[in-house]
């Protein structure tokens, strides 16, 4: 896994809609700080779809990988417009970056 490659993926595929820093703003998508260990649909100040709230999953590496493979399949009704990362290596790299960038 490569955090560096994950950071590049985040900048090119995620940054237009998400922030990762503590206290960062919600954009089109929610701020992701503290995402691991948090339940879906629970970022403060972000207006989620009922689908995200009702999924009621606690984010970890495994289910985040499943979600990033095909977000609309994992949570039908999500407003995340991202089509997904099909390559497992890309998902692992992105998750390695997110684990570091979204923690305290």
Swiss-Prot record:
Post-translational modification N6,N6,N6-trimethyllysine, affected residues: 72
Family annotation (SUPFAM superfamilies): Cytochrome c (SSF46626)
The record's account of how the chain is modified after translation: Binds 1 heme c group covalently per subunit.
Keyword set includes Mitochondrion: yes
Matches recorded under InterPro entries: Cyt_c-like_dom, Cyt_c-like_dom_sf, Cyt_c_1A/1B
Molecular function GO labels: electron transfer activity; heme binding; metal ion binding
Amino-acid positions noted as binding heme c in the UniProt annotation, renumbered to this chain: 14, 17-18, 80
Signal peptide residue numbers: none
Keyword Heme on entry: yes
Any single Gene Ontology cellular-component annotation: mitochondrial intermembrane space
Primary residence: mitochondrion
Compartment list: Mitochondrion intermembrane space
Gene3D superfamilies, sorted: Cytochrome c-like domain
Assigned keywords, A-Z: Electron transport, Heme, Iron, Metal-binding, Methylation, Mitochondrion, Respiratory chain, Transport
General function of this protein: Electron carrier protein. The oxidized form of the cytochrome c heme group can accept an electron from the heme group of the cytochrome c1 subunit of cytochrome reductase. Cytochrome c then transfers this electron to the cytochrome oxidase complex, the final protein carrier in the mitochondrial electron-transport chain.
Family per record: Belongs to the cytochrome c family.
Name of the featured protein: Cytochrome c
UniProt organism field: Candida glabrata (strain ATCC 2001 / BCRC 20586 / JCM 3761 / NBRC 0622 / NRRL Y-65 / CBS 138) (Yeast)
Organism taxonomic ancestry: Eukaryota, Fungi, Dikarya, Ascomycota, Saccharomycotina
